[in-house]
Amino acid sequence: MSRVFKKTCSNGKLSIYLGKRDFVDHVDMVEPIDGVVLVDPEYLKGRKMFVMLTCAFRYGHDDLDVIGLTFRKDLYVQVQQVVPAEPTSPQVPLTVLQERLLHKLGDNAYPFNLQMVVNLPCSVTLQPGPDDTGKACGIDFEVKSFCAENLEEKVSKKDSVRLVIRKIQFAPVEPGPGPWAQTVRRFLLSAQPLQLQAWMDREVHYHGKPISVNVSINNSTNKVIKKIKISVDQITDVVLYSLDKYTKTVFIQEFTETIAANSTFSKSFEVTPLLADNCEKQGLALDGKLKHGDTNLASSTILRPGMDKELLGILVSYKVRVNLMVSCGGILGDLTASDVGVELPLILMHPKPSNEAASSEDIVIEEFARQEPGGREESQEALAAEGDEGS
């Protein structure tokens, strides 16, 4: 059974159909966006019909535009004239889903094909604060269709249909070796040093899955190690309009492990950073959202060699920190404890899913709320309207 997403403009004259809303960036190419637009012929009235793909970086709220400030920058715009089709447009073969939709919807349905360029960022949302309203800041993608005499004509929101999509990346099939780090610390009155090693067995880890952090300690000093603290930091670089860098701790835990002087220690610890434990942190980078609550911590940004970082708008990376709390002893005890630590880079992503082709010619259409006539931004929540519509 093929699932199809449908969105209709508020006047009911124009609908857009897409077979999916997540499009995978394979680093060297991005999956094409193929869909169908259904239009009322009386509404078209000899005008042209366009489909537009927009990638935008939003770093402020729409309500601030009234004071003359624009907090949105279009990073990429691609337009296809669907009706009448331009003679110079390349003839792209129809997909199986497009053929089924055209057969189902009739003569007033038209196919379209859009292709993202490879140097665009992935969808990222910055978690809003509790009092924030409107669209969240971040990188978003939108497919829009409208009828007009030409592209310069101003089209109201109620006369166009817009559907938010996501550009995503999956973990590489053949990841590299796991990271490793070491530090050596010498203390006053100790003839031998303290050596800390930390490593992970894998380069890439998956959202929601435990991350194994291996710790090895050679304590040749006369100091006692009281605790091991492991934390995971998310680093968000906003590189488009400024050089802002935000570091937020998404996981932290202290493990009580007493390591005596002149002894060794080795153990593997499991840590799992989750959005559920960080839902109150404003500005935390998340994977782009389609519905309320359907996202997770942002995936690590995978850069192609030679790529211009500025075009990406927002870069997301992670690091694991391992710190030892070393007691210096004496009458002050832990008040004079010293911190010894190392950092490991962490790549956090989703695994590549298996490709399961639809085994049936049936089409299930999931329809989304229309934009309100007042021009207000439409809801991105799906209606519970899954059914074999239009058959």
Swiss-Prot record:
It is found in: Photoreceptor inner segment; Cell projection, Cilium, Photoreceptor outer segment. Transmembrane segments: none annotated. Residues 369-391 are annotated as: Disordered. It holds the Pfam family Arrestin_N. One of its GO terms (biological process) is visual perception. Its main location: other. Residues 369-379 have a biased composition (Basic and acidic residues). Keywords: Cell projection, Disulfide bond, Sensory transduction, Vision. Homodimer; disulfide-linked in response to retinal illumination. Interacts with CXCR4; the interaction is dependent on the C-terminal phosphorylation of CXCR4 and modulates the calcium ion mobilization activity of CXCR4. Interacts with GPR84. Belongs to the arrestin family. May play a role in an as yet undefined retina-specific signal transduction. Could bind to photoactivated-phosphorylated red/green opsins. This is Arrestin-C. It comes from Sus scrofa (Pig). The lineage of its organism: Eukaryota, Metazoa, Chordata, Craniata, Vertebrata.
